Amino acid sequence: CGSCSSGCPASGIGDMDPRKFLRMALLGMEAEIAASPWVWFCSMCMRCVHACPMKINIPQLVFYGRQQVPREKRPKGILQSCDMALKHDTCSAMGASEEDFRFVVEDVLAEVRETQPEFRDMEAPIDKREAILFVNQNSREPVTEPDEMVPLWKILYLAGADWTYGTKGWAAENYCLFIADEPNWEHIVRTKAKAVDDLGCKVWLNTE
């Protein structure tokens, strides 16, 4: 019916839209789907599923379409981010190590305490055992925009939340999902889940 295409952010890009993509899949045009760059334009936001009266999961088809592309030919940026996340148990797509993360968090926290007296008692715990919340953080903040971590700390502090980061599994992003690399996607999720379990936290709060 085309409802899926009406609200799709990627509709019309590369002469493709969700309805056309679905029809191609129905007609068995796997080679054409795999050759189309549109599988990488789709953000898999699920808006088409919400609009579809039959609730057809087009993003799942997009995911399968991505898997038809040889791994080395998938988009270089997210491919490298996936591979980088596999180098450390931090799961950071920017390659930040456990030591890097701890240094940045402690340095930024010290500055906030010194310059903002109303937050002199604020904490940004790392590896606190049996905290209620295990909080993930996107790698971009500690690596390139460390001050952007502070608003979340303030919210958690003012809410009286019992929370912690972990030196392992702290990175919130998972580019292996977007590259449609299921084994490594699962590896990263399991690494993060183990970090939560090892600290005895009750809730994994993924900020992505």
Question: What are the roles of these predicted feature ranges?
Answer:
Residues C1-F41:
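Ferredoxin-type iron-sulfur electron-transfer modules and their immediate structural context
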Residues A25-N206:
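Iron-sulfur-cluster electron-transfer modules
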